[in-house]
Amino acid sequence: MGIDINHKHDRVARRTAPKSENPYLRLLSKLYAFLARRTGEKFNAIVLKRLRMSRRNRQPLSLAKLARAVQKAGNENKTVVTLSTVTDDARLYTVPKISVAALHVTEGARARILAAGGEIITLDQLALKSPKGENTVFLQGPRSAREAEKHFGPAPGVPHSHTKPYVRSKGRKFERARGRRASRAYKN
């Protein structure tokens, strides 16, 4: 008698539409679903996948990161594409001329990009400008930059773990002695 195969892990969950009720986001999703199907380009498939992602996975992107990407050799006249919010960066002294296609651009970032002679286009305008993703640079924000991510990983207290413990206080008596110094039992 055979053993039934366990199908517990067979299903891979993929979003078929954005979770958001935003009608503009849903229309963009439909547009890029069409483009991904008809062009067969990987660029459009990636845009579609990211349009359907949760906000938590579409982290904001600073103007400084955009500037760094544009200043790389060969990227001067390319359009920077990001499926998130572009935010201003006060540490950036001068903004180069940038062409950006993004879901949202903050007021400060928008003013600085336009003042530098750059352009900001929407993703439906990008679909008309480069339907196959030609002359574009893809960027995304750091997904693991959230404070909550610091608590994920090997358990705090095990050797070589840099995981942040959940503690009620950061005082002397709280996860500071035992296991942290040789004079108190052991040191990991």
UniProtKB/Swiss-Prot annotation:
GO terms for cellular component: cytosolic large ribosomal subunit. Keywords: Cytoplasm, Ribonucleoprotein, Ribosomal protein. Residues 161-171, 178-188 have a biased composition (Basic residues). Pfam families: Ribosomal_L18. Residues 147-188 are annotated as: Disordered. It is found in: Cytoplasm. GO terms for molecular function: RNA binding; structural constituent of ribosome. GO terms for biological process: translation. Belongs to the eukaryotic ribosomal protein eL18 family. This is Large ribosomal subunit protein eL18. It comes from Caenorhabditis elegans.
